Swiss-Prot record:
Disulfide bonds: none annotated. InterPro entries: NA-bd_OB-fold, Ribosomal_uS17, Ribosomal_uS17_bact/chlr. One of its GO terms (molecular function) is structural constituent of ribosome. The keyword Cytoplasm does not apply. It comes from the Bacteria. The keyword 4Fe-4S does not apply. This is Small ribosomal subunit protein uS17. CDD domains: Ribosomal_uS17 (cd00364). It comes from Paramagnetospirillum magneticum (strain ATCC 700264 / AMB-1) (Magnetospirillum magneticum). One of the primary rRNA binding proteins, it binds specifically to the 5'-end of 16S ribosomal RNA. Keywords: Ribonucleoprotein, Ribosomal protein, RNA-binding, rRNA-binding.
Length: 79
């Protein structure tokens, strides 16, 4: 089964080797048929503490690293 990949914004980088990423998705309201923005926060593994608050990054699902961490940051090569 392929690993899920999500894109979001770093909202906290205060922990060692961990960033908190807020991922936003759009869902349709069942009655009013209007699109609503929903967000969820994920703890992601950042091995070298490279990413800072406010940056847009991509995260990939991985094996559990700790109680709350089962995502890792995808480091994309600079173009």
């Amino acid at each position: 089964m392929p690993k899920r990949i999500l894109q979001g914004v770093v909202v906290s980088d205060k922990m060692e080797k961990t960033v908190v990423v807020s991922v936003e998705r759009r869902v349709m309201h069942p009655i009013y048929k209007k699109f609503i923005r929903r967000s969820k926060k994920y703890h992601a593994h950042d091995e070298n503490n490279v990413f800072k608050t406010g940056e847009t990054i991509r995260i990939r699902e991985c094996a559990p690293i700790s109680k709350t961490k089962c995502w890792e940051v995808i480091v994309e090569p600079q173009a």
